[in-house]
Amino acid sequence: GEEIFDKEGNITKVLHKSDIHYNPCFKITFDNGESIVADHEHRWLISFRNIDKTFREVVMTTEDIAKWLIDKPRTSYNIPKIMNANPLNLPEIELPIDPYVLGCWLGDGSKSCGIITNINSKVWEEIENRGYTFGGDLSDGKSAEMRTIYNIRKKLNDLGILNNKFIPDLYMRASYQQRLDLLRGLMDTDGYYHESRKRFVMGTTQKWQAEDLLRLVSTLGIKATVFEVDKKCNGKIFKGWDVCFSTDGLNPFLVRNQDIDFPSK
């Protein structure tokens, strides 16, 4: 009777629970570093790439996959893949803060108040277009503009994210467009496109923030990978995490990088 998401992104109910078995198990590690333990008879819907770049699907057991990987040469056409699930199909809900504006604050906002620091005038225009007003520039005129977004501090506090930045579950379960707006606010303020890797990247110094972004991206049907990296600031080197992903023609920016020629995944 519990509700879960199916591979199409729709909510469905659990109709049956299998018995407990004591079968041989395999640990499967995916190319993004995540692992899962499954018994040898578990059936997987596997995709193989064709020469024309389309995919064919077959059902294989865990044991079948293990034998396949041992016996077959490693080519792009012989590596079994589990295709991404579709974006979560959820209704639009009322949110206390516009998701794009919240994304901007999570990306470039002061954790203790409603101030956002940004150099791009189009970001400010987009925030204003969404019905928000802000104060004058608080910077020294030599750096990015710092402006207070009015009437969001209390809402940030009510969401429990003031002085504690994270993506609230309420936003993780909003509609597709609302979740995409949230991602675009984050990317417009704190993301970039890596030209040589042909990947979209957002970096953070907090691992749990990287995991938050990974969750958000996955709800949009996009596969992302987290890399631990060394970051440098003011001559000091410290640990950080980059969340990297590609898309099938979807630009995760809204007002920035509209002219980049990125390949589909």
Q: Where in this protein do the model-derived segments appear?
A:
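Intein-associated homing endonuclease modules of the LAGLIDADG/DOD-type, together
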Residues: 1-10, 15-236, 242
